[in-house]
Amino acid sequence: MKRAVCILFLAFAAAMPLKASEYKFDNFSANVTAENLEAFTKDMGGLLGSGTYSTGRILGWGGFLLSARAAVMPEPSEENTALGPDPEVMYMPWIQGEIGLPFRLDGFIRATSWDGLTLAGGGLKWGITRPVDTLYSFQTMITVMAQSGVHKDFSLTHYNANMVISFKMPVVTPYIGGGVDYTKLTVEGADNAALIGMREYTTTPRASAGLNFKLPAYIDLSVAANYANYGFGGEASLGVRF
């Protein structure tokens, strides 16, 4: 168990230096405009909604999962110049904890502090099918989540709902899912004072397809590609699961 937790901690620590040096939220105040705010909000919704699930199977009563997760947006959408005119890769890591509850429910919380943005939230997962580990069986679940974030130049509230299905195989479990992200963003600081207090509301679709691996020492690994407002992106999770 100690070894598994150490691996998880090191994986999260190793992800921290991945921050793109020229693509920071601190550039928001100098570059945000009334024209690019909507695209920025849509891209943030897709990024924050990524990585909510890594299989279609709920944990089940008494189950537990602690994971380090990350999502990547290779470049923003064309209209999103709110962090600068030159597109750069953007990462968002976080810690997510999940616990199995009665009535085919899982509860989870997630949190991060990254590039000046502090974000926290949580949600529920409901298994449409009962959790089983039978080979070549399908598992399906629905997830809902809410989270809020604060940066010195903007604040946001994000909600999403997803449906995911996975197929149990001997070594790997493929999964596909889709959902909707609803994001509200408020400008808190901008060089153009007329923008302060401006709010943007967006609703965008998102889809993902990935692979989940059960490794020795209770290690749970998943990698996936996703598609959101910004185009194709990626997400990954490394955790300890019981």
Predicted ranges, named:
Residues 142-214:
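Outer-membrane beta-barrel translocator/channel fold
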Residues 21-27, 201-203, 214-242:
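Predominantly the C-terminal beta-signal and adjacent terminal strand-loop region
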Residues 66, 97, 101-115, 137-148, ...:
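Transmembrane beta-strand segments that form the barrel wall of outer-membrane beta-barrel proteins
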Residues 71-79, 112-116, 129-131, 145-153, ...:
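Sequence/structural signature of outer-membrane beta-barrel proteins
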Residues 55, 95-101, 122-126, 161-167, ...:
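Residues on the lipid-exposed face of transmembrane beta-strands in outer-membrane beta-barrel proteins
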Residues 87-92, 108-122, 150-156, 201, ...:
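Solvent-exposed loop/turn segments connecting transmembrane beta-strands
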Residues 7-15:
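Bacterial N-terminal signal peptides
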Residues 20-133:
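Transmembrane beta-barrel domains of Gram-negative outer membranes and organellar outer membranes
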